[in-house]
Swiss-Prot record:
GO terms for biological process: cell differentiation; spermatogenesis. The gene is SPATA9. It comes from the Eukaryota. Pfam families: SPATA9 (PF15824). Disulfide bonds: none annotated. Keywords: Developmental protein, Differentiation, Membrane, Spermatogenesis, Transmembrane, Transmembrane helix. Highly expressed in testes and pancreas. Low levels found in the heart, lungs, and brain. Very low expression detected in the placenta. No expression seen in skeletal muscle, liver, kidney, thymus, small intestine, colons, spleen, leukocytes, prostate gland, and ovary. In the adult testes, expression was about 6.44-fold higher than in the embryo testes. No expression in testes of patients with Sertoli-cell-only syndrome. In patients with arrest at spermatogonium and primary spermatocyte stages, no expression was detected. May play a role in testicular development/spermatogenesis and may be an important factor in male infertility. InterPro entries: SPATA9. This is Spermatogenesis-associated protein 9. It is found in: Membrane.
Length: 254
């Protein structure tokens, strides 16, 4: 059954009572008029019980007179409409109430089971009877485990040391390789500067013209030959010195 909202229920109740509110209001006003004069007497009778029975008789008589004056058909219709609306409201609310009651019953049952369940300790203490062999072997086991842990620590330390040594050796080899490469480069530079560079001819081949034949020169004087050799050697030494100076400057710049 679908659950109806509260606004719809209130609307249905007002709709059922819309045609009968005037009759019920009139009946209530008549009852109030009849009992209006009796309110002070009722208060006095509550304080003293001497005139209790006559007051009850008069109130009953007046109530009967008021009920006789009220239109019975209107009152009955109003009561019937109230009963029908209350039944419809009860039918609408019955499934919700049943579901809530079932949920409450399940929750209460679960709580009762949890409360009545035997409480277990947080940890179970197991008592074991130790044998003589276990008592004797316990120190040996402890020493063996300590030795194993120490060996593990030594192996780790040895691995760290070996890695450090290998790193240093690698750095040394790299430095030697760099020094060797620098030496090879410097030697190549020296060789390049020491070799003479031939200059290209200043004029084209077409511009060279053959000269007319001349007679051979006379026999040169051999006495000037040692001087020429000495000048040539001094020129060669100056060229070598200049080449070495240039190579040294290039090495310093590198």
């Amino acid at each position: 059954m679908p659950i109806k909202p509260v606004g719809w229920i209130c609307g249905q109740v007002l709709k059922n009572f819309s045609g009968r509110i005037e009759g019920i209001q009139k009946a209530i006003m008549d009852l109030v008029d009849e009992f209006k004069d009796e309110f002070p007497t009722i208060l006095r009778l509550s304080q003293s019980n001497q005139k209790r029975e006559p007051a009850q008789k008069t109130s009953k008589i007046r109530m009967a007179i008021a009920l006789a004056k009220i239109n019975r058909a209107t009152l009955i219709r109003g009561l019937n409409s109230i009963s029908r609306s209350s039944k419809s409201v009860a039918k609408l609310l019955h499934p919700q109430l049943a579901c809530r009651l079932l949920e409450l019953r399940d929750i209460s049952g679960r709580l009762l089971r949890e409360v009545n369940a035997p409480r277990q300790p947080l940890y179970n203490i197991q008592v074991r009877k130790g044998s003589l062999f276990e008592i004797i072997s316990f120190p040996a086991k402890t020493a063996l485990t300590s030795i194993i842990y120490a060996s593990y620590a030594a192996l780790i330390y040895l691995a760290v040391c070996v890695n450090a040594v290998l790193k240093k050796v690698k750095n040394i080899f790299q430095e030697e390789e760099s020094i060797r490469q620098n030496r090879e480069e410097s030697e190549n530079c020296r060789k390049a500067f020491s070799e003479p560079v031939l200059s290209e001819p200043m004029f084209a081949e077409g511009e060279i013209k053959a000269k007319p034949y001349r007679s051979l020169p006379e026999k040169p004087d051999i006495s000037d030959y040692p001087k020429l050799l000495a000048n040539k050697q001094s020129n060669n030494i100056q060229v070598l010195h200049s080449v070495f100076d240039q190579s040294a400057e290039m090495n310093e710049q590198i």
